[in-house]
Amino acid sequence: MSARLVAIALGLLVLAGCTTTRQVAAPAAAVLVGAELDAAQARLAAREQALRAQPVIAFNGRVALARGREGGNGRIEWRQQGGEYRVTLSAPVTRQRWSLLGHADGRARIDGLEGGPREGADAESLVRDATGLEIPVGALADWAAGMRADPARFGPAMVEYDAAGQLLRLHQDGWTIDYTGWQVDAAGVAGGLPLRINAQRDDARVRLLVDAWQLGDAPETQ
């Protein structure tokens, strides 16, 4: 993937050129059995039920995207309302923005790319074809919130927990999602909400650092 494609993809976010991302060993999962496993599974199911009942799920924070030795980073805003989502990447220094609007049927539109808007029938394919980046946009909101994505679209998920029964890792659609930090006092959400998420499939990597979550009737950021 060329540096030019990365620049188009991230809307001139701060690029890392040929910088490699430092790899940190993932924590080992606990082997839970009996009542401990039942409690962990119940907590995950309760989180998913509480979050899917929310009319709006939104977060903002920082994101780093990489494929192989190429990558970049910037600010991210994500707003999910039903089956529709809008994700915006921005670079505060250059004041440039790159946004994706996705729909429940998979259709999507990218604004902010060189050459004007682009549309496609599948969000992941649109992003990949337009930018060369591999971003799991259809499932990322669920994974970021500590939920399994729709198995009808993304296949079954394998779940790993830590010794306290907290969600540690998800495996789904070829991606491995590690949870390394939590907001444990998130009101009404069993087990809290993730603050640090690392996702990887082959040489594609997405790292999220969430600054704030908004649930319910969260106003849309303009």
Task: Say what each PLM segment does.
Residues 1-7:
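Bacterial N-terminal signal peptides that target proteins for export
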Residues 25-54:
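Post-signal peptide N-terminal segment of mature Sec-exported envelope proteins
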Residues 14-17:
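C-terminal motif of bacterial Sec signal peptides marking the signal peptidase cleavage site
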Residues 84-134:
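An acidic-aromatic
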Residues 112-173:
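Flexible, processing/modification-adjacent segments and terminal tails
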Residues 19-22:
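Bacterial signal peptide processing site
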Residues 147-222:
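Gly/Pro-enriched, hydrophobic low-complexity segments
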Residues 45-69:
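A short, Trp-centered hydrophobic/proline-enriched beta-strand micro-motif
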